């Protein structure tokens, strides 16, 4: 009898960080995934975040940065974006867990009596739930790369460190690998690097029961072999397991840099895996493209969170990808929408080859964004509006082209006499084949139209030309929609509806007639763009910007 049991066992790489935060664990993990994938291995990722929020969906972008949305509607950490951009892995609900989500699950189990009246504790109940979350990935791929958020030594991260310590015992050394990312600072006045922070970070990790197998040392300058030998001696790792990660001027150079240091080879050696030689030529070609652009354009991003560009991380990268597809260097000019409200648009936007208004929530800076849209429309500058940016493009058009001077969104002006954008209280969910319902009293968290939905395109439109197909799936994160009561009236004034839901009820893409390139989309195309495969709308937006610059 044929055995149909899936016997594949996944090997796990755990990535921790020390010394300080924002060292780039997510990019390091993504680069490791890219290198392993280039050797023919199947990979996936998981991010374990120590904060108590259930997910980042309701967190302030100034504190957390971007909320990255997956196809299945998960609101996740921005590192999910790095994972998807660098590899073919598809992220979802099972790829991002927070302390809040773990504790929520455990408390619900306790309320249901699943612990049979026992005392619920961090060990074993919380750590067991963390391990269960990690082991969901077992058997699905060759390698799962698990990033532990925060910094070793943080009190809130201790349950996760303890859980992965236990997992080594549960799974065995052949199936687990610990990589620790640290900082080796360069003291310019002394002209030397200092290894002590790395030594102390590893000591902290070892005190929690974990001996790292590989150290990835972030530095400003290359490490000499004697420095690597010193780190290896004091941290009890092999010298060729001390990987120098020198700062690079483009994140897309990182896989090549880590490969040159032998990181992927060392990982395979320690996990006892044999593979084909890596194919890193696509990354080399990408870097060649980055370093030798044929054109240069300036794109203005008129937004609310311009003081923290991490809030627009995927947007930033997608514009770079659009540039790469056109062999063009993209310079970004972040313009505060609040400043624009009281300022002259010409002083902020003059000289820009394209204008983009991104998504966001709340009324702060809204009139500044509308002024930017008017400037793009009147001056025939390529314009791209995303989510709220698309909604405000409709508002601007209704006000200035259709005679509705008080047109607005009910999110921003509930008593508007012409609510061209309004709260959608029900819609058809094509993933579940059910009607979804929301109202003004619904919780903020997890109640938006989230995840991938189909969009049917109108041919002979900018969107139709960009995609070159009839139907696409794009990711959403919003509550408010185009009000169909105004559809015909706006179409008669020159608004083009070039994308809708399959039933035609939900407006997904709008354009305007007689403009070189003016597109607004209700979804977030930036979440599906990759450096080697730019999203079609970003590709064509940058192409239009290049044409605009050339006149």
UniProtKB/Swiss-Prot annotation:
Functional description taken from the UniProt entry: Catalyzes the ATP-dependent amination of UTP to CTP with either L-glutamine or ammonia as the source of nitrogen. Regulates intracellular CTP levels through interactions with the four ribonucleotide triphosphates.
Organism: Desulfotalea psychrophila (strain LSv54 / DSM 12343)
Gene Ontology terms: cellular component: cytosol
Sequence positions that bind UTP: 21, 194-199, 230
Residues binding ATP, per UniProt: 22-27, 79
Source domain of life: Bacteria
Record-linked InterPro entries: Class_I_gatase-like (IPR029062), CTP_synthase (IPR004468), CTP_synthase_N (IPR017456), GATASE (IPR017926), GATase1_CTP_Synthase (IPR033828), P-loop_NTPase (IPR027417)
GO biological process, one term: 'de novo' CTP biosynthetic process
Subunit structure, as described in the record: Homotetramer.
UniProt keyword list: ATP-binding, Glutamine amidotransferase, Ligase, Magnesium, Metal-binding, Nucleotide-binding, Pyrimidine biosynthesis
Region annotated Amidoligase domain, chain positions: 1-273
Lineage: Bacteria, Pseudomonadati, Thermodesulfobacteriota, Desulfobulbia, Desulfobulbales
Further details from the record: CTPSs have evolved a hybrid strategy for distinguishing between UTP and CTP. The overlapping regions of the product feedback inhibitory and substrate sites recognize a common feature in both compounds, the triphosphate moiety. To differentiate isosteric substrate and product pyrimidine rings, an additional pocket far from the expected kinase/ligase catalytic site, specifically recognizes the cytosine and ribose portions of the product inhibitor.
Name of the protein described by the UniProt record: CTP synthase
Reactions catalysed according to its record: UTP + L-glutamine + ATP + H2O = CTP + L-glutamate + ADP + phosphate + 2 H(+); L-glutamine + H2O = L-glutamate + NH4(+); UTP + NH4(+) + ATP = CTP + ADP + phosphate + 2 H(+)
Metal-binding listed as a keyword: yes
Binding site for L-glutamine: 360, 388-391, 411, 479
């Amino acid at each position: 009898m044929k055995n149909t049991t899936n016997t594949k066992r996944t090997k796990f790489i755990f990535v921790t960080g020390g010394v300080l935060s924002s060292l780039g664990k997510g990019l390091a993990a993504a680069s490791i995934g890219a290198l392993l994938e280039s050797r023919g291995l199947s990979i996936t990722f998981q991010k374990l975040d120590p904060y108590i929020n259930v997910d980042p969906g309701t967190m302030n972008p100034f504190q957390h940065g971007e909320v990255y949305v997956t196809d299945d509607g998960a609101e996740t950490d921005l590192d999910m974006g790095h994972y998807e951009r660098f590899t073919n892995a598809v992220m979802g609900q099972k790829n991002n867990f927070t302390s809040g989500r773990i504790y929520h699950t455990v408390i619900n189990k306790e309320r249901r009596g699943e612990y049979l009246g026992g005392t619920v504790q961090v060990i074993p109940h919380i750590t067991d739930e963390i391990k269960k979350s990690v082991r969901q990935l077992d058997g699905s791929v060759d390698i799962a790369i698990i990033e532990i958020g925060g910094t070793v030594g943080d009190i809130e991260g201790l349950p996760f460190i303890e859980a992965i310590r236990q997992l080594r015992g549960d799974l065995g050394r052949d199936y687990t690998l610990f990589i620790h990312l640290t900082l080796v600072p360069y003291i310019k006045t002394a002209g030397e690097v200092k290894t002590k922070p790395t030594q102390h970070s590893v000591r902290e990790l070892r005190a929690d029961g974990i001996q790292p197998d590989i150290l990835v040392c972030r530095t400003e300058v290359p490490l000499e072999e004697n420095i690597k030998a010193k780190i290896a001696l004091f941290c009890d790792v092999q010298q060729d397991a001390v990987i120098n990660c020198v700062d690079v001027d483009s994140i897309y150079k990182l896989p090549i840099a880590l490969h040159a240091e032998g990181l992927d080879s060392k990982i395979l050696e320690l996990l006892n895996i044999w593979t084909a030689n890596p194919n890193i030529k696509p990354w080399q070609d990408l870097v060649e493209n980055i370093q030798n652009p044929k054109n240069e354009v300036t794109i203005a991003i008129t937004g609310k969170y311009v003081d923290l560009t991490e809030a627009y991380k995927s947007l930033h990268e997608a514009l770079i990808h659009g540039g790469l597809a056109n062999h063009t260097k993209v310079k970004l000019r972040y313009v505060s929408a609040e400043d624009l409200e009281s300022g002259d648009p010409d002083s902020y936007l003059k000289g820009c080859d394209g204008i983009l208004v991104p998504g966001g929530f709340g009324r702060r800076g809204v009139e500044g964004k509308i002024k930017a849209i008017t400037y793009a429309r009147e001056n025939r500058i390529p314009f791209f509006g995303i989510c709220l940016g698309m909604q405000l493009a409709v508002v601007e058009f209704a006000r200035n082209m259709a005679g509705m001077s008080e047109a607005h969104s009910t999110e921003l002006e509930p008593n508007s006499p012409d609510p061209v954008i309004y709260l959608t209280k029900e819609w058809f969910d094509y993933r579940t084949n059910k009607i979804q319902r929301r109202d003004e009293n619904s919780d903020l968290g997890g109640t938006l139209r989230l995840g991938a939905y189909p969009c049917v395109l109108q041919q002979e439109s900018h969107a139709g030309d960009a995609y070159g197909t009839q139907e696409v799936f794009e990711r959403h994160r919003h509550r408010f929609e185009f009000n169909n009561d105004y559809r015909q009236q706006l179409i008669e004034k020159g608004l083009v509806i070039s994308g809708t839901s399959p039933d035609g009820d939900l407006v997904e893409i709008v354009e305007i007639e007689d403009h070189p390139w003016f597109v607004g989309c209700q979804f977030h195309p930036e979440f599906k763009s990759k450096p080697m495969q730019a999203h079609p709308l970003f590709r064509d937006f940058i192409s239009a910007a290049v044409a605009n610059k050339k006149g």
